[in-house]
């Protein structure tokens, strides 16, 4: 009974297992049919249970066998890979080329020939038309000898660098250079900036120039603290007078300008040569020579900065200096000047004879107005149109001639005739006042007519001034008050030039001693007598009622001139404010 029960239990378990296997097989076959479209024609329900069990057991064994075989193959492959490099070396080394094989001998010879061709030196001259045969030992030994000679050369170079640079790292560099037989130095380590002897000399010269400039400032008492220039408006003034070029005095050939800049960035260089440059932050400024005419500026400096440009030749410069202001046929007016600098009122107040006092004074005002522009021609941009642009000549920056003495002499001369002219003008006024009540009614009518003509002339000049101010470029905006001043003086000069000179004489006395004024256009007693003697009698008669009419028309012109004379004070205040900022 017990044995049967044991067999029955096995049978029941086998049937249960087979039923599960059948279900799995049916599911797998259905999956193959639906997904892959494979129909194996197997029906697990038809087969008995023992067949299914045997089949599944066999499949399990196959799977185990395949897994074990794959694992063994993988392990064997890994072992082969680990042992493969030494085996390959052993296999490569034993088959050394035997001298008996002809193919291997040919290959070896061809390789040796290639090596020889690479190592061959350039052919030496052929003795008697035959090439020199170089043995193989020499060909092989030459690069070795070169490599053996290279290390001592590098050691010598390193020793020199030790002496010059005195570095502790030079030993390490010597080891590196000796280890490398290429013959090339390695660019490593800290680089040092060396200053050449030439640069040191230049620096010493600059320092000497700076120290000399301080001593020159102390030696020249009249030039100290005359010019204050900011870094924004760097200009220096040279004051040439006359055409003399004497170089006797060292004080006269050295130009010193004292700078008071708020920023303190400007450095001063004073040289005794023909050219002088002021370097500010590395930039060079060429100087512009400025003439100060007592008729135009009336004691006010006119500073203009000019950008560096190629200047004109000396021929134009000499012609500019030697030209007379009263020469009507000279070329001074047509030198490519801007329209802002041209004389606009050259014909007003002039008659057919150019001998009368009014015409000469008019033209002298025009000449004095044009004179600063003559300096522009040979020192600035405007000279490019007339001069040769390819010339290397630069404008001289220093004063020519004994300008200090001439300056003082001209001031003394100008003050003496001005005092005489004041007396003459006072006498003329008294005579005119005495003649006014004693004159007849006809003379009064003539005076009124001429007074109206003078007023119309002044109105025309004012209209022309307004038109020209509108047409002038923006660059001349700073010089407008000075132009108005000159124009007002011009209208006064057509009637009576003596009073103009009296007005101009007042600011001349307040000028600093370092600024040289041109010889002012003055009419002394002797000159006035000569000019009056040369004038025909008709012109002299016409001049007397003009002077009488001038006294009637003085108040409007004087009020205009007073308003114009107030403007320079405002301009000076503005300039002081700019310099302080």
Swiss-Prot record:
It is a single-pass membrane protein. Keywords: Acetylation, Cell junction, Cytoplasm, Endoplasmic reticulum, Membrane, Nucleus, Phosphoprotein, Tight junction, Transmembrane, Transmembrane helix. Residues 71-581 are cytoplasmic. Residues 108-126, 421-433 have a biased composition (Basic and acidic residues). Coiled coil: none annotated. The modification Phosphoserine is found at residues 179, 215, 250, 297, 305, 310, 343, 368, 414, 425, 456, 477, 493, 495, 567. It is found in: Endoplasmic reticulum membrane; Nucleus membrane; Cell junction, Tight junction; Nucleus, Nucleolus. Residues 100-204 are annotated as: Interaction with RELA. It comes from the Eukaryota. The modification N6-acetyllysine is found at residue 263. This is Protein LYRIC. It comes from Rattus norvegicus (Rat).
